Amino acid sequence: MAKDIKFSEEARRSMLRGVDTLANAVKVTLGPKGRNVVLEKKFGSPLITNDGVTIAKEIELEDAFENMGAKLVAEVASKTNDVAGDGTTTATVLAQAMIREGLKNVTAGANPMGLRKGIEKAVTAAIEELKAISKPIEGKSSIAQVAAISSADEEVGQLIAEAMERVGNDGVITLEESKGFTTELDVVEGMQFDRGYASPYMITDSDKMEAVLDNPYILITDKKISNIQEILPVLEQVVQQGKPLLIIAEDVEGEALATLVVNKLRGTFNVVAVKAPGFGDRRKAMLEDIAILTGGEVITEELGRDLKSATVESLGRAGKIVVTKENTTVVEGIGNSQQIEARIGQIRAQLEETTSEFDREKLQERLAKLAGGVAVIKVGAATETELKERKLRIEDALNSTRAAVEEGIVAGGGTSLMNVYTKVASIVAEGDEATGINIVLRALEEPVRQIAINAGLEGSVVVERLKGEKVGVGFNAATGEWVNMLESGIVDPAKVTRSALQNAASVAAMFLTTEAVVADKPEPNAPAMPDMGGMGMGGMGGMM
């Protein structure tokens, strides 16, 4: 396919139009008085959102060169979302400001490589200063503030703070769509996995349709059990102890299942069988987790063990187990705390090494089940459109809170970027490097300016006043007051601000050093089919 090539100024100008188109659509959402953007969906109702990365991903421009510019900035939002989970609009605003300011200087004759060096120096200094002024997050109220600012909803802030308090910082907090109008929190203590009883005849509570086992033994194996003779020796030992039994196996079927059900119905002993969670290697790892949590062993041929050799000593124990049609929850496993800690450490090490998003999610789930528990926030709303928008906001708030726990918090509302202004301005440089530093200085003002503009105020007036204020004092766009941002609970996670600045600078530097752009030439439209009007059947009379 033939290519279209543009060089230097023409190339950069074409891409800048794309940058501006995307950034202008995204930046209207910034701040407490930011507006929403409506996105058309091919199926279902349109999506209304103020989430920068969601908007950026939807934008596709007709002109190939403009589209490349737009995609570069979308990459800033996407990367910031991957690293910090929030701050995508701030990242987009910073990138646009650096690109526009940089392009003016390149057009005026500045060397792009010199500008790049200056930008990198300035961003390094800004990040060091951000780390210095960040404060560790302490207590439930701080967590609630971070989540409330991100979601623009105090109720959501309280909900997330409560969830994190209940399951710990390593706990898993998931979002589900609720059938009702209200948003509520559901916390599962202990370890839960998504496998239910093998037969409904095993239930102990017919009203709730669940089986509850108090102080049970737990047989854990990766084998399929179809012959009752295989587990008869260990069954007899459990019956002698007078305790209930939970069997976790690849499957329990045929004669073995029938015998267990008959004995359960006769009241000989209380037993529930469930399938092992997960698949393949993940199943082995999860069975090992359950064994460590309950102080039992996984009976597997890989370790030279068969079911006939199993004894009561090789079974796990727990305070209580609840089995429903779809889930099994193990509460108060009596495993050795040192072994559990070692296992948690092992999973954390795997988390740091993995590059797969899917694996990371599954490891995080396993970690939470061992370390704390799982909290589910059930998101409710009046309409499907509102539900989608609310779910996106809560997701951002959740990511924001996790980022705050990791690296602490800084003053919100773009104030922290202005607080590092003096440090960046004090860097000694000359020529194009100094110009690069000035580009970053100009960009640092942009989030505050845009928040003020979205609140219907003159951005430059707010920026100039902020330069003269003490560190931590900023403009509360929601009320129009000048306040101490940290004391007023207007905070941003340091990680979110840092990621936004780093990613914006990275893309801006790449943009400014671009000298040629290559795109596919648009294919000419195929000619329309000729009119077939003259080929009526009437003209064929002579052929009869």
UniProtKB/Swiss-Prot annotation:
Which residues take part in binding ATP? T29, L30, G31, P32, D86, G87, T88, T89, T90, G413, N476, A477, A478, D492
Keyword ATP-binding on entry: yes
Q: Does the keyword Nucleotide-binding apply?
A: yes
Q: Which keywords does this chain's UniProt record carry?
A: ATP-binding, Chaperone, Cytoplasm, Isomerase, Nucleotide-binding
Q: What does the entry list under GO cellular component?
A: cytoplasm
Would you say which domain of life the source belongs to? Answer: Bacteria
CDD domains, sorted: GroEL
Group of enzyme by EC: isomerase
Q: Name one GO molecular function term.
A: ATP binding
Share what the entry says about its subunit structure, partners included.
Answer: Forms a cylinder of 14 subunits composed of two heptameric rings stacked back-to-back. Interacts with the co-chaperonin GroES.
Q: Which family does it belong to?
A: Belongs to the chaperonin (HSP60) family.
Protein name, per record: Chaperonin GroEL
Which organism is this protein's natural source? Bacillus mycoides (strain KBAB4)
**Organism ancestry:** Bacteria, Bacillati, Bacillota, Bacilli, Bacillales
Q: Which gene encodes it?
A: groEL
